[in-house]
């Protein structure tokens, strides 16, 4: 519950900051990543969790992102190409948020 509450707190902070500082030209956005292949999760993944996630990956076709894919979303948000984006939460999760 604490993890979920903290994530939603960051969403609110992103939007509030965008509202407050947007008039001064400050853009505030967030990226909501799904699983990323960093290797950090491997020691924490229990056999039970692996048994639940593995079949989901195969049936739904979801993938674990490479760090470069997540970085590309962040680079886009920092670029002039996203100059009209403010207060957004960009999912970079390969479809995990719709499952």
Please give the residue ranges for each predicted region:
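Cytosolic ligand/metal-binding cores
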Residues: 1
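Active-site helix of classical SDR
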Residues: 6, 14
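C-terminal substrate-recognition "lid" of short-chain dehydrogenase/reductases
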Residues: 64-92, 97-98
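A glycine/serine/threonine-rich, flexible loop-to-helix segment
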Residues: 23, 35-60
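Short, small/polar-rich loop/turn modules that mediate ligand/substrate recognition or access, typified
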Residues: 22, 27, 85-87
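Conserved SDR Rossmann-fold cofactor-binding beta-strand/turn motif
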Residues: 27-37, 78, 91-93
